[in-house]
């Protein structure tokens, strides 16, 4: 869902059907998921949980490298990660901007020293948007530092009106609004592209609870 919303083209209308059509185009353009592009993990102690088999191979963490075979996104990697018992609960979308082939700044200015510019969406209940970029350090000379600008709905007059994630989904389900849901066609497309992974999943790697 997150991948589709980030990669989809503008819909013809701000309506569930039009948005779902564009999301399904993204799903259909996905390359098959190769087992070599997937990491599966299981936190230590999971098999001791009530109702869990001591031989369980179920993952509690997964990281996937995806690519889209279309004109706009060909060659651009997408990385999806989700897991339980992480060091912190986060819902983040981070877009890294590709560095230009040449820079007008001097080699010793510090440009690129802290990685590429990022546009980051924090989808937690108090949603935030931040942009990291390089800016000139005050004073003579040309030295650049990594700076950041941020907007947070928690700092607006409407902070109390923000719905929690499941509140929004339940409300949309009651209203019959499937904008945030995957259609049957979308699920089928994703299932087809997951067949190589389902046929030969990589082994789970143990990791410590409350860790990265």
Task: List each language-model region with its residue ranges.
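Secretory/organelle targeting and membrane-embedding segments
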Residues: 1-212
């Amino acid at each position: 869902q997150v991948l589709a919303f980030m990669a989809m083209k503008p819909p013809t209308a701000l309506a569930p059907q039009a948005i779902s059509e564009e999301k399904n185009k993204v799903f259909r353009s996905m390359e098959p998921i190769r087992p070599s592009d997937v990491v599966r993990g299981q936190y230590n102690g999971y098999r001791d949980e009530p109702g869990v088999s001591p031989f369980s191979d179920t993952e509690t963490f997964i990281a996937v490298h995806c690519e889209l075979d279309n004109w706009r996104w060909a060659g651009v990697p997408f990385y999806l990660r989700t897991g339980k018992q992480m060091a912190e609960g986060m819902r983040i979308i981070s877009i890294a901007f590709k560095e230009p082939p040449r820079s007008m700044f001097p080699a010793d200015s510090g440009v690129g020293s802290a990685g590429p510019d990022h546009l980051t969406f924090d989808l937690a209940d108090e949603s935030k948007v931040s942009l990291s970029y390089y800016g000139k350090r005050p004073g003579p000379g040309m030295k650049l530092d990594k700076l950041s600008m941020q907007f947070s709905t928690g700092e607006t007059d409407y902070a109390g009106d923000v719905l929690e994630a499941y509140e929004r989904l339940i409300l949309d389900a009651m209203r019959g609004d499937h904008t945030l849901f995957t259609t049957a066609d979308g699920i089928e497309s994703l299932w087809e592209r997951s067949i190589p992974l389902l046929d030969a999943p990589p082994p789970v790697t143990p990791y410590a609870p409350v860790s990265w």
